[in-house]
Swiss-Prot record:
Protein name according to UniProt: ATP synthase epsilon chain
One Pfam entry name: ATP-synt_DE_N
Gene field: atpC
Family statement drawn from the similarity comment of this UniProt entry: Belongs to the ATPase epsilon chain family.
SUPFAM superfamilies, alphabetized: Epsilon subunit of F1F0-ATP synthase C-terminal domain (SSF46604), Epsilon subunit of F1F0-ATP synthase N-terminal domain (SSF51344)
Amino acid sequence: MSTIRVDVVSAEQSIFSGEAKFVALPGESGELGILRGHTPLITRIRPGSVRIEKADGDEEFVFVAGGYLEVQPDRVTVLADTAIRGHDLDEAKAIEAKKRAEEAMQNRGTDFDMALAQSEFAMAAAQLAAIARFRRKK
């Protein structure tokens, strides 16, 4: 099977750079699966898990907190707002963040920002889903 070049980068660092057989990630309108020869595409990505099936058959998981995806027939570039390797995700922090967001949505104060609380909740839920996926593949 032919491979495609994959680069996952955040503002802080390069998270993954290498050859892959397949890449799956959460696009703005749904889950995307990318193989070599894919039609060129630029789209926003939602918070969630990027699954990279590497050329050697191993899988790599990266959590992204949104960003942009560029696909060329021989290259995939993920420009993430924040990117964290699957094994570096902190479940306790994600659970606490989700709990804080839920409490904020229930206890609306005068300076309450519903959009911010919903965004934080979605981010924490996406991190927990990514952690669950990463654990299943171990």
